[in-house]
Amino acid sequence: MKKEIASHLLEIGAVFLQPNDPFTWSSGMKSPIYCDNRLTLSYPKVRQAIAAGLEELIKEHFPTVEVIAGTATAGIAHAAWVSDRMDLPMCYVRSKAKGHGKGNQIEGKAEKGQKVVVVEDLISTGGSAITCVEALREAGCEVLGIVSIFTYELESGKEKLEAANVASYSLSDYSALTEVAAEKGMIGQAETKKLQEWRKNPADEAWITA
């Protein structure tokens, strides 16, 4: 499944690999990869494959789930499709409470004691997903874990998720993506080496000249 989803993401341009012309993330870090999973919304067959895959992950790892929660905003649509497939209630969680109206951070019903799985589009450092998990825990929910479309497999992300004591599973990952890109002839050996070096230590820009 990992390579199938990776292939979909590459084909629709949801993921770009530019090891020779790095992107600059909002954090200022140079990166050979940029992921925009919002593009999956525009491709019915791709989003259906993602919804089916996320459902499979949830049934395998979190079979007692009672509520599906999407992260705002990128996880909302995927959470809705998954909850519909599983015939479960759905809510979504903002990064912070609204400054008007009821001031809700959680929209929809997620009640105390309910078992919740969070749906996220992308795991990089894990920050937005963890914010969602913490809000649900504060509301008294039992968060079983997180499922996502893609992960960069960054050590910093893994460490933050472990520190937050939350399990996380992704449909596809950086390793599968680079492998598929190489198989498709989208990157050569030199580019593959740069991509591998970046993942080892993203903060060290030595990978750019690797």
UniProtKB/Swiss-Prot annotation:
User: Mind listing the GO molecular function terms for this protein?
Assistant: magnesium ion binding; orotate phosphoribosyltransferase activity
Signal sequence coordinates:
none
Q: Sorted alphabetically, which SUPFAM superfamilies does this protein's record hold? A: PRTase-like
CDD domains per UniProt:
PRTases_typeI
Annotated S-S bridges: none
Q: Where does orotate bind?
A: 124
Q: Which domain of life is it from?
A: Bacteria
Could you identify this protein by its name? Orotate phosphoribosyltransferase
> What organism does this protein naturally occur in?
Bacillus cereus (strain G9842)
